[in-house]
Amino acid sequence: MATTEGALAGVHILDLTDERGIYGAKLLADLGADVVRPEPPGGDPLRQRGPHRQGVADGSTSLWHAFFASSRRFFAVDPTTPEGAEQLRRLVERSDIVLTCDGSFGTAAVDLDTARKQQPELVVVDTS
């Protein structure tokens, strides 16, 4: 669950990163930002990364994911569908910051250049 106190309380962040940006998103969430991370249907592939609690890899026992996922909210979305792409666009509109990695999940469904023109205050961080 997102933290409600901290230096970044009230800042809304959309996390579209992959493993290259997941730690930065965790740090921002730990500082109080409301970080939302969409996942593909079936869950984020990072949920399968070991080690796993009691050696069982079922998508909910990844110790790696448990650490990096703390303080954030997750939801499933399919950005290849019109409905999923629209969900992501609405999230961008409500965000103060969008974290991306070139080619990461959901970035193809969102035109961040247009979003920046419509929301000049939007901060886009692209991690390589």
Task: Set out the residue ranges of the language-model regions.
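N-terminal helix-loop segment corresponding to the beta1-alpha1 unit
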Residues: 1-128
